[in-house]
Amino acid sequence: MAARLCCQLDPSRDVLCLRPVSAESSGRPLPGPFGALSPPSPSAVPADHGAHLSLRGLPVCSFSSAGPCALRFTSARYMETAMNTSHHLPRQLYKWTLGLFVMSTTGVEKYFKDCVFAEWEELGNESRLMTFVLGGCRHKLVCAPAPCNFFTSA
């Protein structure tokens, strides 16, 4: 079973949280065309899956066809205009969890560069380019515990 995600803006930490929908989830799904969401499979992603990838700062579960368990992006206020309003990022991740398309590592990197960084470029705020991602699941960050840029070289 593929992971199902909900989004929650945490204004106290200025982060956008994407979390699996489960009985213990405190997040609320964003309104959208997704319908009812079901809990993820706890064993959907091998613990070492994606550990070799050069796309740094993302939990290794981000590269699974099951989708990420949880991602938290800093600079959520910048994302609010570019991403949250259209639900673009949650929609793409939801399609990914359903297996409607499969991204290679290059595809994932291109997706984040094009859809996240390119849209933030239009907002004209340089601080958003240092975007940090925290894992909220059992899959460890490639570069934990120090914050890192998405595209730090391996």
Swiss-Prot record:
Stretches that traverse the bilayer: none
HAMAP family reported for this sequence: HBV_X (MF_04074)
GO cellular component assignments: host cell mitochondrion; host cell nucleus
Species the sequence originates in: Hepatitis B virus genotype G (isolate IG29227/2000)
Record's subunit section: May form homodimer. May interact with host CEBPA, CFLAR, CREB1, DDB1, E4F1, HBXIP, HSPD1/HSP60, NFKBIA, POLR2E and SMAD4. Interacts with host SMC5-SMC6 complex and induces its degradation. Interacts with host TRPC4AP; leading to prevent ubiquitination of TRPC4AP. Interacts with host PLSCR1; this interaction promotes ubiquitination and degradation of HBx and impairs HBx-mediated cell proliferation.
Signal peptide from the UniProt entry: none
Cellular localisation: Host cytoplasm; Host nucleus; Host mitochondrion
Lineage of the species this protein comes from: Viruses, Riboviria, Pararnavirae, Artverviricota, Revtraviricetes
Major location (coarse): host cell
Taxonomy, superkingdom: Viruses
Protein name in UniProt: Protein X
PTM summary: A fraction may be phosphorylated in insect cells and HepG2 cells, a human hepatoblastoma cell line. Phosphorylated in vitro by host protein kinase C or mitogen-activated protein kinase. N-acetylated in insect cells.
Family recorded in the similarity comment: Belongs to the orthohepadnavirus protein X family.
Record keywords, A-Z: Activation of host NF-kappa-B by virus, Activator, Apoptosis, Host cytoplasm, Host G2/M cell cycle arrest by virus, Host mitochondrion, Host nucleus, Host-virus interaction, Modulation of host cell cycle by virus, Transcription, Transcription regulation
Function: Multifunctional protein that plays a role in silencing host antiviral defenses and promoting viral transcription. Does not seem to be essential for HBV infection. May be directly involved in development of cirrhosis and liver cancer (hepatocellular carcinoma). Most of cytosolic activities involve modulation of cytosolic calcium. The effect on apoptosis is controversial depending on the cell types in which the studies have been conducted. May induce apoptosis by localizing in mitochondria and causing loss of mitochondrial membrane potential.
Annotated S-S bridges: none
Single GO BP term: viral genome replication
Region (Mitochondrial targeting sequence): 68-117
